[in-house]
Curated annotation (Swiss-Prot):
Main location: membrane
GO MF entry, a single one: manganese ion transmembrane transporter activity
A Pfam family the protein falls into: Mntp
Protein name: Putative manganese efflux pump MntP
Record-annotated membrane-spanning stretches: 3-23, 39-59, 65-85, 104-124, 125-145, 167-187
Biological role stated in the UniProt entry: Probably functions as a manganese efflux pump.
Length: 188
């Protein structure tokens, strides 16, 4: 695989991570270096691991994964997006104690949801006989960088527009989930 194709693939895979990070940046009261590192590291790591897992699985589980991957991504994104919208309507005291999307189960759910497409890429690489190791590294690095950029842009917008942007962040996640479901069920 040539470098231009690889970078194009990595950027395409990073778009979901970027959009989700944008939504996360919108919801955080105060964005710290730890938030940036945690989300960037996890999204990058999951984006790098999933092609490797898909490549190792090869053809044996391809049909099963293709049948359910979009439902898993949809469910995870709708749950987290719905939670973000719900939290936007809470009073100020409750909002301060809410879950941080860069920690715990929210972090794991978002990491899995944004990297499922990379699993399919790994399967595809196995089918055409391309080694996965270098592409996985590039995919992970670009996803991590795009995640940090998304969080920074989201935080900037969140500081300016507050609750409305927080609701938009949840709607973005739900929209991404619906897009994934739409593309996979209708084959678009």
């Amino acid at each position: 695989m040539d470098m231009i194709t690889l970078f194009g693939l990595a950027l395409a895979l990073a778009m979901d991570a970027f959009a989700v990070a944008l939504g996360c940046g919108l919801t955080l009261e105060r964005l710290t270096g730890r938030h940036l590192f945690r989300l960037g590291w996890h999204f990058g790591l999951f984006q790098a691991m999933m092609p490797i897992i898909g490549w190792l699985a090869g053809l044996t589980v391809q049909k099963w994964i293709e049948t359910y991957d979009h439902w898993v991504a949809f469910g995870l994104l709708v749950c987290v997006g719905g939670k973000m919208i719900h939290e936007a309507f809470q009073d100020e005291e409750t909002r301060e104690s809410r879950d941080d999307p860069t920690r715990g189960m929210s972090l794991i759910m978002l990491s899995v949801a944004t990297s499922i497409d990379a699993l399919a890429v790994g399967l595809s690489l196995a089918i055409v006989g391309i080694s996965v190791w270098f592409p996985a590294l590039i995919i992970g690095i670009i996803a991590g960088v795009m995640t940090v950029i998304g969080m920074l842009l989201g935080r900037r917008a969140g500081a300016r527009w507050g609750q409305r942007v927080e609701i938009a962040g949840g709607l973005i996640l739900i929209g991404i989930g619906l897009k994934i479901l739409w593309e996979h069920t209708l084959g678009m």
